[in-house]
Amino acid sequence: MFPIFDPVALGLYIVGYIFMLIIAATIAPKVAKSISGRFTLYGAMALTAVLVVLTTAFIIYLFVTVALPHMGAYGLSFLLGLIFFVVLMNIITYFASPYLINLSYGARPDPRLQQIVDEVAARLGAPFKLKAVVVDGPPNAFAYGNFLTGRYVAVTSSMLALTDRRELEAVIGHEIGHHLHRDNAIMLLFGILPSIVYYLGVTAVHMAMASSGNRGGNPAILAAVGIAAVIVSFLIQLLVLAFSRLREYYADTAGAKAAGKEAMQFALAKIHKFYFANPEAHEVVRDSKFRALFIYALVNAVANPFVSVTRSDLEEIKRSSYSVFQEIFSTHPPIPKRLKFLDELQF
């Protein structure tokens, strides 16, 4: 979500962000701990999706029943126009982003990688053709594209050097899993919802401030609903991030099916081990507009092809600590949790 650049929007954004920080630091870890292990992966995804949709629907219902009567004669038209604009901008981004990614990362076809992608896709029963491309940069991989541009699986040249054949197949399986699960389209849809709620809130506050009070409306009610919407939009954003992390576990199951749980674990462990030794490597990907696509979300450096991981290394990584606070704001789960998840995975 990006605030409109005016003092009111900036102030609301700060209030919402502070609220999100408080939730992430206090309530969210306790809730996550209390429900940990109580749901299957599919149950957790369904529950989180329902919470996102119901919370968004409640705010829209609140606008229609409480705020709309105080928005003047053109309130409904403005409301629908705003929602249409937010949805349209996101759809345009969805269809344009593959071209931007290809340009940004210098994507180029690779016959050897294409052969591996085709083999893994057949193993997973993918019903569509996938385009395999090699890109420059750190050891990473990502899935992008759509039915118009084609569906891509991108692997960096340094990832090719870092992994052996089975580990590479697991990484590719993870990315094909994103395509099979329609994650790009699903996360586009869910990502739109907090943006809609946020901009509805900002607009309501603006209209309340501009109201002269002679139209029969109550600016105070309109402002209160607007502020509440902005705050709740940040809560919805936290839920969307949680949903994204669950989709990553879901994609890991595809990687494990493609090449085995151990291959998926060792691929993740190699990435983790390399970047743990290069803490400065996190900055570039953290600033990337496409970081949510990566198999590993906070990495960037020149990979050392001689990184190796032993079974004892793997077990040590599983036991390593991670920041719960940082996890709540991430699109990807911590590697130790993903390794433990794969341990418990059964086919």
Curated annotation (Swiss-Prot):
It is found in: Cell membrane. The chain crosses the membrane at residues 8-28, 44-64, 76-96, 141-163, 185-205, 221-241. PROSITE patterns: ZINC_PROTEASE. Gene3D superfamilies: Metalloproteases ('zincins'), catalytic domain. The active site is at E175. It is a multi-pass membrane protein. Its EC number is 3.4.24.-. Keywords: Cell membrane, Hydrolase, Membrane, Metal-binding, Metalloprotease, Protease, Transmembrane, Transmembrane helix, Zinc. Zn(2+) binds at H174, H178, E248. Its cofactor is Zn(2+). Its main location: membrane. GO terms for molecular function: metalloendopeptidase activity; zinc ion binding. GO terms for cellular component: plasma membrane. Binds 1 zinc ion per subunit. GO terms for biological process: proteolysis. It is an enzyme of class 3 (hydrolase). Belongs to the peptidase M48B family. HAMAP family: Pept_M48_protease_HtpX (MF_00188). PANTHER family: PROTEASE HTPX, PROTEASE HTPX HOMOLOG. This is Protease HtpX homolog.
